[in-house]
Amino acid sequence: YPDFLNMKTNQYERYHIIFLVKEDTSMDESIPKEERKYGRKNLYEMISASNVKYFKKRPLIPKSLLRKKRDCIIVGSACEQGEVYQAILDDVDEDKLEEIASFYDYLEIQPNGNNAFMLRTSDQEYVTNKRGEGKKNRYWKVNSEEDLININKKIIALGDKLGKLVVATGDVHFLSEHDAKFRAIIMASKGFDDADNQPPLYFKTTREMLDDFAWAGDRAREFVIDNPKKIADSIMDNIPPIPPGTFQPHIDGANEELTEKCLNMAKDLYGDPVPEYVANRLQRELDSI
């Protein structure tokens, strides 16, 4: 993979991706260490690396790191900013498209409204950006809702051929439809010209999702209900975001040394033997550390 940390941002590709922790038993001491599952740990290690080691204007995760850390993590192809969708927009050949899609555990399709912004872009292959520079317009061939549906159909065909679950997702960014105005404010502050044209990225009901995928006919239920349920059922129950415990560093003899120092200080202040009420309070404080 390219050394993107020493490259300009327009010299390498970056994509959105979805991670779901499938299983984590890293803190279960009843299981031998070599048999434990480390999904949550792997996820957090990638997040840490993205913010510390691979930060370039934003947190990034190299695919090479993901390959090492994807054990017990389910990887989804994400939205139109995902690698699969972008490859379709770029008209890559079928063999390359299948190679790209095979990397993911499931493929995503999303409502037309999510990607309606493409219909507002130019139908020219190259456009001029704010700096007057020529730039390829990835969306120039997407001119109708039928074009959006055809892209989703291509993803479905890919999933069928590769044996991947195809899941209808909402790319949810906010809870309720009226919350779009808050995202518009955030996007406007970042300089987006179309911030007021917010896509419907709210948490939709099952009926709303079924209506959005009515074009899929009898398979709409498969994409909206059945396949998401299969993904959910494959995930271990009750994985807390933060494992229980304080995880203080272990230093040999630290507990004994701290107790001895505190007790000696108490004797200097209150005499020896230390009064019972002082000793009890000291013990309570030590137990909480």
Where are the regions that the model predicts?
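Phosphate/diphosphate-binding loops
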Residues: 14-22, 155-161, 165, 174, ...
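Active-site glycine-centered loops adjacent to acidic/histidine catalytic or metal-binding residues
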Residues: 171
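Extended substrate/RNA-proximal surfaces in nucleic-acid metabolism proteins
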Residues: 1-161, 223, 260
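Hydrophobic alpha-helical scaffolding
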Residues: 33-36, 141-148, 196-202, 214-221, ...
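Generic recognition of stable, solvent-exposed alpha-helical segments in well-folded globular domains
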Residues: 38, 95, 99-102, 150-157, ...
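Flexible loop/turn segments at secondary-structure boundaries
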Residues: 82-85, 114-118, 174-177, 240-241, ...
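Generic, well-ordered alpha-helical scaffold segments in large soluble proteins
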Residues: 46-50, 99-103, 154, 158-162, ...
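Non-catalytic structural connector segments
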Residues: 111, 125-134, 165-168, 216-288
